[in-house]
Amino acid sequence: MMGGLSSEKEVSLESGRNIFSKIDRRKYDPVPIFMDSRAALWEIPVKLLMRNSTRDIEEDLEEEAKPIPYETLKERVDVVCLGLHGKYGEDGCMQGLLELLGIPYTGSGVLASAIGMDKYVCRRILEISGMDVPRTIPIPRSRWETEKSCVKQEVAQRIGFPCVVKPCREGCSTAVKKVVSAEGISDAVENAFHWDNLVLVEEFLTGMEVTCGVIGVDAPEALVPSETIPTDDVLSLQDKFLYGQGENKTPARLPAEQIEKIRENAVKAFRALNLKGYARIDMFARNDGRIAILEPNTLPGMTPSTVLFHQAAASGMTQTGLIDRIIQFALEVHAGKRGPL
């Protein structure tokens, strides 16, 4: 399932195409399902799947594709391989709908997906679990509108500069800004409020940004971690997913003991957040040796160039093999559930 309503729908299309291309056809009969901008589902032919953008696909849905009412989805598929990203795709909304329909799906469940999308709630859980996280101040829109000067003073005193400003519930570095002085706070916060009613201001970490995939259900295992090398101070969506943008080094250029520490922290975060199937944990190897957890990505990009496939290859898995394991984890989770679903 690909497309959707979020700012990441073009990446979702790339993920869906790649999953469709790389899935093991000896075991599975893939059905490309596209979610349009009104959240309607369509079974699309390959010629539409290969279009350049979601807009190009939507132009010919009525003539070329077959609508799939949600209530009949279970008659068409045995498991949904989620290629959706961002709001309404990886925030628990689609997961909840699939639970109601009784259809197995890849990735984490409703609550874990919702928590993973909310950076502040996620960070609080990780902190309570004893993990290192960046110092963070949450700013609700209502407080910003009535106490702007107090908020700016609190940022200067508790966080300092440079700092990072971001929407609380958006993925892939949407509207994330590095602010180097007090003069830049207002513009960055106002911009972030275009995306969410809750904005986070956090400390700007120094060291090496790393990311580590984790797969599994009851016994999760960490893949080989990667060093992420941004084209700017903050990783963009293009850095994370698209061809020729940004750079990853797998494995990360760190001592073996530091690599193992990163893998251990990734699994610990995966467990603390009750993630399932697969996820990518973004972290920072601080200059003092500590590993700070930034956030999880509960439905990592599955584009051909995504870092998750680099890590799988370094761990001895092909793209087809990783996709197969992710689907099997989905079936395992579904089989372990109790009740009518």
Residues covered by each model-derived region:
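ATP-binding N-terminal substructure of ATP-dependent carboxylate-amine bond-forming enzymes
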Residues: 1-111, 115-117, 121, 128, ...
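Active-site "cap" helix and flanking loop/linker of ATP-utilizing ligase/carboxylase catalytic domains
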Residues: 227-279, 307-341
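Conserved metal-phosphate-binding beta-hairpin within the catalytic cores
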Residues: 203, 213-214, 270-302, 312
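Hydrophobic beta-strand scaffold residues
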Residues: 30, 104-105, 133, 163, ...
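A glycine- and small-aliphatic-rich helix-loop capping segment at beta-alpha/alpha-beta transitions
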Residues: 96-105, 181, 186, 314-316
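Phosphate-binding site of ATP-dependent enzymes
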Residues: 177-264, 285-292
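Active-site nucleotide/adenylate-binding loops and adjacent lid/helix of ATP-dependent enzymes
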Residues: 1-2, 6, 14, 70, ...
